């Protein structure tokens, strides 16, 4: 007996049943020969291979090699119908593009693997592109190469360069704006009282009590940027970490622990002065200044037990 599956593909009842069972496990599910025999309740390998061959002829199943073992994978009816309309050369070119996934494949690699003439390959690619089966994308690693992938897929980060690239070009303006936003956000945690008190105050490192959280995490930064909608691309904690490491390299941040950063006092002073390092003479005077606890006491938050503390009437630093 024979049956029909959607899109007009003629199949026997056994082939239709096997395909339905394979697709019920989800797109991309792989099956061994033994698993297919068990699903169909077929003891004879010859009978199973007859059904599998029917599905192969209709492009409703394909062979996939996994860990040196040959397995079977079901194909959507719409995808099979698409291949049914292709010429033999187009189907061959399409199969290599499909296998390349989100990494894509270079047009010259297609020619080498298919052993087709350059003119035939270009004709197939043009036809597949016009039908929106495949598309060409730019690679940041190989800008002169024409990379092809399935039309429905999004290129991998290795191809696009991630959020730092726009149309294959490094977006310096976008990166610099994010670096400024990240630094500003972290500085509000490191110096919550603002920066103006450093303009004429002591140019020394600020000390904190152990219970003071004067840093920001990459997750906090990401949540802030996402909520503020300052980026039109999706960022990840790894992207934020990369930005923070750039600021660490520029001595604008220092790493407290894993994925935790705080701004440096030098970056605050540089921003307030509008210039780089202070003059050598002023630096020498700073080094000679005596340390006084009164210049730093505001950085230690009051404790709820302070009222019970007994102080000496007089004490010396």
From Swiss-Prot:
What keywords tag this UniProt record?
A: DNA-directed RNA polymerase, Nucleus, Transcription
One of this protein's GO BP terms?
tRNA transcription by RNA polymerase III
Tell me what happens on changing residue 171 to H.
Answer: Cold-sensitive. Abolishes interaction with BRF1/TDS4
Q: Where in the cell is it found?
A: Nucleus
The protein's matches in Pfam families, at most eight in alphabetical order, are given as: RNA_pol_Rpc34
The UniProt entry, under InterPro entries, shows: RNA_pol_Rpc34, RNA_pol_Rpc34-like, WH-like_DNA-bd_sf, WH_DNA-bd_sf
Checking Gene3D superfamilies in the record gives:
Winged helix-like DNA-binding domain superfamily/Winged helix DNA-binding domain
Impact reported for residue 135 to A = Cold-sensitive. Abolishes interaction with BRF1/TDS4
The residues that cross the membrane are none
What SUPFAM superfamilies has UniProt attached to this entry? Winged helix' DNA-binding domain
What GO CC annotations are associated with the protein? Answer: cytoplasm; mitochondrion; nucleoplasm; nucleus; RNA polymerase III complex
Main location, first listed in the record: nucleus
Q: Answer whether the UniProt record assigns the keyword Transcription to this protein.
A: yes
Q: Does the keyword Nucleus apply?
A: yes
Q: What is the effect of changing residue 89 to A?
A: Cold-sensitive. Abolishes interaction with BRF1/TDS4
| Role | DNA-dependent RNA polymerase catalyzes the transcription of DNA into RNA using the four ribonucleoside triphosphates as substrates. Specific peripheric component of RNA polymerase III which synthesizes small RNAs, such as 5S rRNA and tRNAs. Involved in recruitment of Pol III to the preinitiation complex. Involved in the configuration of an initiation-competent form of RNA polymerase.
According to the record's subunit comment, the protein's assembly and interactions are: Component of the RNA polymerase III (Pol III) complex consisting of 17 subunits. Interacts with BRF1/TDS4.
Q: Which family does it belong to?
A: Belongs to the eukaryotic RPC34/RPC39 RNA polymerase subunit family.
The identity of this protein, by name, is DNA-directed RNA polymerase III subunit RPC6
Tell me which species this is from: Saccharomyces cerevisiae (strain ATCC 204508 / S288c) (Baker's yeast)
């Amino acid at each position: 007996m024979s049956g029909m599956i959607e899109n007009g593909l003629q199949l026997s009842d056994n082939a239709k049943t096997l395909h339905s069972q394979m697709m019920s496990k989800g797109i991309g599910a792989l099956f061994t020969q033994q698993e297919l025999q068990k699903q169909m309740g077929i003891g004879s390998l010859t009978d199973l291979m007859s059904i599998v061959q029917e599905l192969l002829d209709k492009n409703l199943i394909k062979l996939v090699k996994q860990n040196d073992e040959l397995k079977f994978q079901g194909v959507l009816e719409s995808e099979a119908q698409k291949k049914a309309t292709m010429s033999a050369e187009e189907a061959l070119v399409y199969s290599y593009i499909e296998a390349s996934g989100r990494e894509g494949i270079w047009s010259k690699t297609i020619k080498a693997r298919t052993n087709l003439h350059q003119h035939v390959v270009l004709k197939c690619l043009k036809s597949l592109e016009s039908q929106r089966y495949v598309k060409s994308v730019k690679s940041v690693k190989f800008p002169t190469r024409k990379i092809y992938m399935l039309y429905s897929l999004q290129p991998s980060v290795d191809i696009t360069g991630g959020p730092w690239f726009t149309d294959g070009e490094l977006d310096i303006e976008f990166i610099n704006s994010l670096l400024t936003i990240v630094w500003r956000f972290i500085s509000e945690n490191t110096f919550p009282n603002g920066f103006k008190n450093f303009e004429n105050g002591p140019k020394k490192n600020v000390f904190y009590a152990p219970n003071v959280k004067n840093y920001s995490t990459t997750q906090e930064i990401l949540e802030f940027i996402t909520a503020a909608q300052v980026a039109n691309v999706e960022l990840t904690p790894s992207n934020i970490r990369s930005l923070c490491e750039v600021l660490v390299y520029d001595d604008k941040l220092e790493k407290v622990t894993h994925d935790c950063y705080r701004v440096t006092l030098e970056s605050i002073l540089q921003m307030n002065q509008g210039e780089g390092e202070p003059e050598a003479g002023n630096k020498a005077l700073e080094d000679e200044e005596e340390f006084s606890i009164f210049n730093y006491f505001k950085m230690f938050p009051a404790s709820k037990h302070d009222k019970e503390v007994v102080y000496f009437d007089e004490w010396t630093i």
